[in-house]
């Protein structure tokens, strides 16, 4: 028996929509990263973009467990301006309460995808929106019920 390797013409991409309201961030990000890579398909081929297109809505209502959501001493994100002494930091709580709360999900998924040209192509298949409106109705996305797969996925106790 030979090892199966998919050809680019054989790849079929589906559109999924995931509601992130009250969903734990890390569990959501790891599942979305696997779906973007295509690891949930039996025709997975590591060197091809065989993943699906993912739409995440209600990104502003994603949950962080423990003290990570605190605005003062929660999870810290660092960036550097490129100038001496130019390290800047912000917390996950400030980003979620700020102007672009969808960046928390994008950063979490991006850090779980490989850092190369294929990873950049796979990240272009991720669409994250802060509220429940999205412009991808024409693609007829299928609703992916992430919360019902495991009771730990939905954060009821926070």
From Swiss-Prot:
UniProt KW keywords = Ribonucleoprotein, Ribosomal protein
Record's InterPro entries? Ribosomal_uL13 (IPR005822), Ribosomal_uL13_bac-type (IPR005823), Ribosomal_uL13_CS (IPR023563), Ribosomal_uL13_sf (IPR036899)
Gene Ontology CC entries for this record: cytosolic large ribosomal subunit
A Pfam family found in this protein is Ribosomal_L13
Single Gene Ontology MF annotation: structural constituent of ribosome
One GO term under biological process is: translation
Listed Gene3D superfamilies: Ribosomal protein L13
Q: Which residues form a coiled coil?
A: none
Subunit comment = Part of the 50S ribosomal subunit.
Q: Which family does it belong to?
A: Belongs to the universal ribosomal protein uL13 family.
Q: What does this protein do?
A: This protein is one of the early assembly proteins of the 50S ribosomal subunit, although it is not seen to bind rRNA by itself. It is important during the early stages of 50S assembly.
Please name the HAMAP family in this protein's record. Ribosomal_uL13
This one is known as Large ribosomal subunit protein uL13
Provide the species name. Answer: Rickettsia canadensis (strain McKiel)
What would be the name of the gene that encodes this protein? Answer: rplM
